[in-house]
Amino acid sequence: MTADKQSSTLKLNRLLQLCSANLPVGGFSFSQGLEYAVEMNWISGQKSTFEWIELNLSESLSRTDLAILKRLYQALDSSDFTAFKLANQHLIACRESSELRFADLAMGKAFVRLLKQLDSLDSEPYSELLNEPELSFVSVFAISAYLCELDLTAAQSGFCWTYIDNQVAAATKLVPLGQTQAQNLLFDLSAEVDHLLTIANQLKDHEIGGSLPRLAMASAWHETQYTRLFRS
C-alpha cells in the first residue's frame, strides 16, 4: 500500500470518527426542535420526517452552517484568527432560540474539552481560538477537521452527515419510526448533500443566513413542553 493510499485511508477514518454518533459531545441529547414538532403532529411518519429535515438542511444548514464552515476553513488556511472569531460570532448570532443557541454552545464546549485531550491531534496552535468564551460546535468541528487534514468538501459533507444522522436517530425514537424507515431516510437525505454543498459554496458573504420561523418557534415552545426526552 502506498503512502498516499495510507494517508487517504487515515483521512477517511478520521472523518468517520469526527462524524460518529459515539463522539462524546452530547449531540444525542438535542432534537433541534423536532421533539415539539412531533408533539404538535407536524411530523407523523417517514414522509413528514423527510420533509422536516430536508427543509432544515436546504434553508438553514446549507445557508448558514455550511457556508460559514467554508469561511472558517479559509480563516484557518490563512491563519486569520480575527476572521475565524467573527465567523464564529456570526454562527452564534444566527441561532434563533435560546435552546438552539444552548445546544450549539454546549456541544461546542464538550468538543473543545475532548479535542484538548486527544493525544493524536496537536491543538496547541489553535489554543487562542479554543479558549474563546463561546464557540459554536461548527467552529470546533472546523478546527478538528482541519487538524485531521480533511479538505473542505469532506468536512462539509461530514458535518451534513452528523446533522442528518442525529435528526433521524431522534425521529426514530419520537415519531416513532422503524429501523428500515430510518435507513431509507438516511439514504434519501444523504443524497441531497451534493446539492447542499453547491448552495453553500456559491453564497456571497451578504447572502449567508436563513430564517425558519416554524423551527425557531418549535424550539422556543419546547422549553415549556410538559414531557421531554431531549434538551432541545
From Swiss-Prot:
Quaternary state and partners of this protein? UreD, UreF and UreG form a complex that acts as a GTP-hydrolysis-dependent molecular chaperone, activating the urease apoprotein by helping to assemble the nickel containing metallocenter of UreC. The UreE protein probably delivers the nickel.
Q: Give the UniProt keywords, A-Z.
A: Chaperone, Cytoplasm, Nickel insertion
The record, for InterPro entries, names: UreF (IPR002639), UreF_sf (IPR038277)
Q: What protein does this entry describe?
A: Urease accessory protein UreF
Query: Where on the tree of life does the source sit, at the highest rank?
Result: Bacteria
| Localization per record | Cytoplasm
Task performed by this protein: Required for maturation of urease via the functional incorporation of the urease nickel metallocenter.
Q: Which GO terms describe its cellular component?
A: cytoplasm
What Gene3D superfamilies does UniProt report for this protein, alphabetically? Urease accessory protein UreF
